[in-house]
Amino acid sequence: KILSDRKIDAIDVSSACYDTFNYWLEPTTFTPGWRKYLAAEVKKVVDIPVLAANLIRSPEQAEKQLEEGTQDFVSLGRPLIADPHWVEKVEQGKENTIKRCICCLYCFESMEENAYKYTHGKCSVNPFVGRESQILDRNGRGDKVVIIGAGVSGLTAAELLSKRGFDVTVLEKEAQPGGQINLAKMPPNKEKLAWCVEDLITNAKLAGAEIEYYTTALKSRIEQYSPKYVIC
């Protein structure tokens, strides 16, 4: 209220400090929107706009919190590292193609580690962090590529190669994609890890990749596609 009375234009409500890091930059165990009550309390006593991040991970959640009056503006931090086109995709009605931040904190882990190497941070969801100037060459010319396994690596390759103009088929021996993520997401409150697989599947298919399940990558099976390249 004092800040509001001093003619501050807006207040951005966050929480915690370095000593309570997990309440500032939450890991996967925290529920999206868990600290919206903080912004709501501030709004009760000020007449200026209130901004808050509130662990927002979807446009639907952002819109709901605005409608509830929890806050006046939405702040996005890590979601824009995971997908710099987050806002653009919402404007274009392509919300289903957003690569969601899974709250794994690899961005901060890598930045702290790489600070001593004078390099950049990384992201588990966005391999182009720090490599934004690299443009995908559309040089696939329809060449056939067979990818063995629909885990995170295989699906990432499928999406990027499809965007480059390759004819991509992914062979997955199980009934569902995900690989090791299907184990990693099982502990309580680790469900967000599955988002990266869901988002990769959506974007890989939209780019033109085909995924075949219950398919073991035997040599005879692979040869049926006459691939120019095989990734395993």
Briefly describe each language-model feature range.
Residues 1-148, 152-163, 168, 176:
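Flavin-dependent oxidoreductase catalytic cores
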Residues 171, 227-232:
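Short hydrophobic core segments
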Residues 11, 147-210, 214:
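Beta1-alpha1 glycine-rich phosphate/pyrophosphate-binding loop at the start
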Residues 46-48, 165-166, 207-209, 225-227:
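Short glycine/proline-enriched coil/turn segments at helix->beta-strand junctions
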Residues 39, 87, 201, 219-222:
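Short amphipathic alpha-helical segments and helix-helix/interface helices
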Residues 68, 204, 222-225:
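A short, aliphatic-rich alpha-helical micro-motif
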Residues 212-225:
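A conserved short coil-to-beta-strand element within the FAD-binding core of flavoproteins
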